[in-house]
């Protein structure tokens, strides 16, 4: 688990000089986030809920939501917030249901992992199919 130690050393970087440098930092952040996915999957025991590729998709979707921004200072601020969020997740500052609710259910990435207890009544069947734990 070398990823948590690498993320802790990140401080506030200087502002990007131009849009090209800010773009490079976005790609660096995306690589760091993708490299920490196996650690996150292990820490939060997410193997039964989501696949690593689906988490990569959720990260890229968050980045694409801000693709229209062209101000390097705003991009730097968003990267800083993203690194702070990633550090909190890797340092286990969030609980499993926070991760599932924000990045799995919020993105619609819940995968069906097979037959679970189906329940005896319609109410229980609906409850078990809607409950993502």
From Swiss-Prot:
* Protein location: Mitochondrion inner membrane
InterPro entries associated with the record: Complex1_LYR_NDUFA6_LYRM6 (IPR045299), NADH_Ub_cplx-1_asu_su-6 (IPR016488)
Stated name of the protein: NADH dehydrogenase [ubiquinone] 1 alpha subcomplex subunit 6
How is this protein positioned relative to the membrane?
A: Peripheral membrane protein
The organism sits in which domain of life? Eukaryota
Assembly mode: Complex I is composed of at least 49 different subunits.
The protein's UniProt keywords, in alphabetical order, are:
Electron transport, Membrane, Mitochondrion, Mitochondrion inner membrane, Respiratory chain, Transport
Function of the molecule:
Accessory subunit of the mitochondrial membrane respiratory chain NADH dehydrogenase (Complex I), that is believed to be not involved in catalysis. Complex I functions in the transfer of electrons from NADH to the respiratory chain. The immediate electron acceptor for the enzyme is believed to be ubiquinone.
| Similarity-based family | Belongs to the complex I LYR family.
Q: What GO cellular component is one of the record's annotations?
A: mitochondrial inner membrane
